[in-house]
From Swiss-Prot:
It comes from the Eukaryota. The chain crosses the membrane at residues 49-69. NAD(+) binds at residues 129-131, 150-151, 153-155, 175-176, 190, 209, 262, 266, 292, 303. Belongs to the NAD(P)-dependent epimerase/dehydratase family. UDP-glucuronic acid decarboxylase subfamily. It comes from Arabidopsis thaliana. Coiled coil: none annotated. Residues 91-100 have a biased composition (Polar residues). UDP-alpha-D-glucuronate binds at residues 180, 208, 216, 219, 222-223, 276. It catalyses: UDP-alpha-D-glucuronate + H(+) = UDP-alpha-D-xylose + CO2. This is UDP-glucuronic acid decarboxylase 1. It is a single-pass type II membrane protein. The gene is UXS1. Residues 70-435 are lumenal. Catalyzes the NAD-dependent decarboxylation of UDP-glucuronic acid to UDP-xylose. Necessary for the biosynthesis of the core tetrasaccharide in glycosaminoglycan biosynthesis.
Length: 435
């Protein structure tokens, strides 16, 4: 037995790797290299969960970045994946400029010109409305990702239903008087009832949307570094004493009248926008929009063009308030959309008039509607409404010079396009009522 014990001890000693004679520590027996596979096997078996989590992280990073990588070169793609994985491991998120650098656009949300234009993520408040839905069509058509925020107070899902299957379109039912957190490059803030019928129906809601809604959207723009465009209105000029109206004109507005919830609300929104620009460095654009018409207008929203067209199609008299000598200028909606996009992409801060300088009295407009729809249509006169501006015509010299923009579609060219849309909708409405 002693002989066997000596043999086994001798065998273990042969496998022992002696340490240096000068070491102050007692020698330890090291495992033979042949035992390493057993250690790796133990590691893989006992730490499977860790390896699974790392694999999921790497795979998720690849699939998230896949749309961006498809537009980048091979070297740039590899660099982007490496940066993203390193951020995930160190738990330190990249700044916005990390992914915007070299891709165009940057933190300001400006759209670069050229084939390799960076796809932007854009939010449009009030995007289910008349103007908003046409703007969304434009942005989707050029390849951007668009998020529409609307509470459907005046907006209609029918204006956007053709985009529901588009992967670059998203619709959120939300009221802008409440904050919302999104990551976007540009903000088009259109949310607010623009028709007298709607904003007089709920004046408190109207001014809250103008003030609180604008505050929330400006706060979002500040947090994420987005460029912000406010759609203001020619109503900020009130009943003007200057004709035509330039952007430098301060206006003549009744601050306590029936229309003031909208007029003064928009003036306050402009003030907030410029204060955020001066105080917080937010890039703001202000579009003072004059009378606009076109498809998707509400059939009975009280605005003069939609009123005249709907009344004539239904064989009702056209309602003219006052003597009919008030003047307005009318721009087609596609011209306005082009102006909004040009303003957003331009580097000029501050207000711009966007409108058609062609001026018509209400009686002249009624005659054009009769020419297009029904020469036998009649006119009915009613007392004028309170605070109705007598004249309204934009001076668009600034937009021409700095934005290279001016309207292209005349009233006689654009009105038939609107009439076609109104005929179809009124016909469908009558069929739904069984008329």
């Amino acid at each position: 037995m002693k002989q066997l014990h000596k043999q086994m001890s001798s065998k273990r000693d042969e496998e022992t790797i002696p340490m240096s004679q000068s070491s102050p520590y007692s020698p330890k027996t090291l495992k033979h290299p042949r035992s390493l596979p057993r250690s790796l096997h133990y590691l893989f078996r006992e730490q499977r969960l860790l390896f699974i989590l790392v694999g999921i992280l790497i795979g998720s990073t690849f699939f998230i970045l896949q749309p961006s990588l498809s537009r980048l070169g091979a070297a740039e793609s590899t660099s982007l994946i490496t940066r993203s994985v390193s951020y995930a491991v160190t738990d330190s998120p990249p700044s916005r400029s990390t992914f915007n650098s070299g891709g165009g656009g940057g933190r300001t949300g400006r759209v670069p010109v050229g084939i390799g234009r960076k796809r932007l993520r854009i939010v449009v408040t009030g995007g289910a409305g008349f103007v908003g839905s046409h703007l969304v069509d434009k942005l989707i058509g050029r390849g951007d990702e668009v998020i529409v925020i609307d509470n459907f107070f005046t907006g209609r899902k029918e204006n956007l239903v053709h985009l529901f299957s588009n992967p670059r379109f998203e619709l959120i039912r939300h009221d802008v008087v409440e904050p919302i957190l999104l990551e976007v490059d540009q903000i088009y803030h259109l949310a607010c009832p623009a028709s007298p019928v709607h904003y007089k129906y709920n004046p408190v809601k109207t001014i809250k949307t103008n003030v609180m809604g604008t505050l929330n959207m400006l706060g979002l723009a500040k947090r994420v570094g987005a460029r912000f465009l406010l759609t203001s209105t020619s109503e900020v000029y009130g009943d003007p004493l200057e004709h035509p109206q330039k952007e430098t004109y301060w206006g003549n507005v009744n601050p306590i009248g029936e229309r003031s919830c909208y007029d003064e609300g928009k003036r306050t929104a402009e003030t907030l926008a410029m204060d955020y620009h001066r105080g917080a460095g937010v890039e703001v654009r202000i579009a003072r929009i004059f009378n606009t018409y076109g498809p998707r207008m509400c059939l009975d929203d009280g605005r003069v063009v939609s009123n005249f067209v709907a009344q004539t199609i239904r064989k009702h008299p056209m309602t003219v308030y006052g003597d009919g000598k008030q003047t307005r200028s009318f721009q087609y909606v596609s011209d306005l959309v082009e102006g909004l996009v040009a303003l957003m992409e331009n580097d000029h801060v501050g207000p711009f008039n966007l409108g058609n300088p062609g001026e018509f009295t209400m009686l002249e407009l009624a005659e054009v509607v009769k020419e297009v729809i029904d020469p036998s249509a009649t006119i009915e006169f009613k007392p004028n409404t309170a605070d109705d501006p007598h004249k309204r015509k934009p001076d668009i010299s600034k937009a021409k010079e700095q934005l290279n923009w001016e309207p292209k579609i005349s009233l006689r060219e654009g009105l038939p396009r609107m009439v076609s849309d109104f005929r179809n909708r009124i016909l469908n409405e009558d069929e739904g009522k069984g008329l």
